[in-house]
Amino acid sequence: MLRELMHARVSADLVVGSSVGAMNAAYFAGAPNAAGIDKLEKVWRGLRRHDVFPVTFRSVLGFMGGADNLIDPSNLRRLIEHNIPFPNLEDAPIPVHVVATNLGGATVCLSSGPTVEALLASAAIPAAFPSVHIGEHHLIDGAVGSNTPILNAADLGATRIIVLPTGFACALHEPPKGAIARALHALTLLIAHQMVRDLRQLGGKVDVFTIPNLCPLDVSPYDFSRADQLIEQTAGHTRKWIEGGGLSRPGDPEFSVAAYTLTLRWLPRVTLGRKYDSPAIAKTNNEEPVLADTDAESSNLEPINAM
């Protein structure tokens, strides 16, 4: 999606991200150009499940023995450190805001402070990864509070928002295998339902352009083996949407809600679940759209600095 938006000369005034989308947003904020997007694609094409979710026999035993989390975040930390060039959020070439959730369920927006800690907090899937202590908060995955960037982007002053949904496995024929796979699937479904809610809540107050997600889709977010296929399919899908005037006509909120609700109905009863992240492109008072990847209701947003 980012590749095709860049080809269409879409630029960003700010970036807001949650969960894995926060990592994509931070990477883009550090290299908001075609070369940066190409490198981001190469990162995703080269990832394997063990690079992010290194579940071992020892970790399973520890979890069964009372450990707080199943996965050691060291691999994820190294991945972030290796690929995100700015040490603090405020150092990014484009303003970037990372959304996480505190243990009370409130959404917390991190706009400054250590980048790695903020991204680890936003992607800290409960039970899978440990919570991250930042300031006065113990933070977990931003998707737990709200995972669509729409409301946060509007709260940050965006008047034009382009939503890049991660989508979800809407055509699985059986439940994902394994606890982590099911948790990820559950989170992706939650994002989709939150998007429907947020579109309704926004109610046409800003211009929202939602790139249609791939559906039917039968790939679990725990399956990294088909990254090449999904990247190219999504690029083609986005290109057709742009060529059809998608960037020139803001979507009617109720039409977007209806389209997403129809997509959700693809889900067989057996596939209950959800997770991952979605960047959005937003826009302030200038004429060009803005990339925003966030997820929180304005009433729940609690800005803090990551100290």
Language-model features, listed with the residues they occupy:
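Alpha-helical membrane-targeting segments
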Residues: 52-71, 173-196, 254, 258-274
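Short active-site oxyanion
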Residues: 11-14, 105-106, 137-138
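A short alpha-helix-loop-beta-strand transition element characteristic
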Residues: 84-95
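Patatin-like phospholipase
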Residues: 1-80, 111-121, 165, 169, ...
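Conserved catalytic block of serine-dependent lipid acyl chemistry
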Residues: 21, 112-215, 232-239
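C-terminal helical/tail subdomains of lipid-metabolizing enzymes
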Residues: 198-307
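Short beta-strand scaffold segments in enzyme catalytic cores
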Residues: 96-101, 130
